[in-house]
């Protein structure tokens, strides 16, 4: 039952899918943390895998960069493959001095400069929020693992190279924790089609200070985030 962008067979995906932007990161997660792994889709090299984690069937698939790409895959996973839970796992940039590089952020809500949710909400402002049961499960898992998290708003930007850097001042004033490019679209799709979604990201760089993580630091922090998320996923 292939879709225009996914060539998996019916039943290939688990009810819960971890959803990194990078398909190679999806491959890394599958090969590092899952057992009995099978690659289930590879259209446009947007790789997807299904395996087991501590006996629980889990899938992982790349979403691509930005709301349009993420929304395509999220829609098809939910509507055509029956996926119930989508958890974005990725990275973000920080803007506030209170937020540090390597912090783990859980996106309770997602602000955006994109118009996609206004389009689906007939011109009105839609509150793009995470599913509470997913959020609380990941928060509790983080506590169990001793991983400190920050819970609040992220900002899903349409432009990576923004022409309006003064907007960062507004974001900081309004308490936005991190800037990424997918969560608002993912939350909108999930609400539209009756699924549950959450965004969990690590801070890879600081927009204000220019501080960046090394590749080794990024991988270590990312691994901690994945383990905490997977341990939450098996209890959904």
Curated annotation (Swiss-Prot):
Catalytic activity: a purine D-ribonucleoside + phosphate = a purine nucleobase + alpha-D-ribose 1-phosphate; a purine 2'-deoxy-D-ribonucleoside + phosphate = a purine nucleobase + 2-deoxy-alpha-D-ribose 1-phosphate
Positions bound to a purine D-ribonucleoside: 5, 180-182, 204-205
Pfam families to which the protein is assigned, alphabetical: PNP_UDP_1
Ribosomal protein listed as a keyword: no
Superkingdom: Bacteria
Site (Important for catalytic activity): 218
Annotated catalytic residues: 205 (proton donor)
Residues bound to phosphate: 21, 25, 44, 88-91
GO cellular component: a single term: cytosol
Keyword Transferase: yes
GO biological process entries: purine nucleoside catabolic process
The protein's Enzyme Commission number: 2.4.2.1
GO molecular function: purine-nucleoside phosphorylase activity
UniProt enzyme class: transferase
Keywords: Glycosyltransferase, Transferase
Oligomeric form and interacting partners: Homohexamer; trimer of homodimers.
Function: Catalyzes the reversible phosphorolytic breakdown of the N-glycosidic bond in the beta-(deoxy)ribonucleoside molecules, with the formation of the corresponding free purine bases and pentose-1-phosphate.
Family: Belongs to the PNP/UDP phosphorylase family.
Protein's name in the database: Purine nucleoside phosphorylase DeoD-type
Classification of source organism: Bacteria, Pseudomonadati, Pseudomonadota, Gammaproteobacteria, Alteromonadales
Record gene name: deoD
């Amino acid at each position: 039952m292939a879709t225009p962008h996914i060539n998996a067979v019916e039943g290939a995906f688990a009810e819960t899918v971890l959803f990194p932007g990078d398909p190679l990161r999806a491959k890394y997660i599958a090969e590092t943390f899952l057992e009995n792994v099978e690659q289930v889709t590879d259209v446009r090299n947007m790789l997807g895998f299904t395996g087991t984690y501590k006996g629980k069937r889990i899938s992982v698939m790349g979403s691509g960069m930005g709301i349009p790409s993420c929304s395509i895959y999220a829609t098809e996973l939910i509507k055509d493959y029956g996926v119930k839970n989508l958890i974005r796992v990725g990275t973000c940039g920080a803007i506030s001095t209170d937020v540090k590089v390597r912090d783990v952020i859980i996106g309770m809500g997602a602000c955006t400069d994109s118009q996609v949710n206004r389009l689906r909400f007939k011109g009105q402002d839609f509150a793009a929020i995470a599913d509470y049961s997913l959020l609380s499960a990941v928060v509790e898992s983080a506590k169990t693992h001793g991983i400190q998290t920050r819970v609040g708003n992220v900002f899903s930007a349409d432009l990576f190279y923004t022409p309006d850097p003064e907007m960062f001042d507004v974001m900081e004033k309004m308490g936005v924790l991190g800037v990424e490019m997918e969560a608002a679209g993912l939350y909108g799709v999930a609400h539209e089609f009756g699924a549950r979604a959450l965004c969990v990201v690590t801070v890879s760089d600081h927009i204000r200070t220019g501080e960046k993580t090394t590749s080794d630091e990024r991988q270590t922090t990312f691994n901690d985030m994945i383990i905490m998320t997977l341990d939450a996923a098996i209890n959904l």
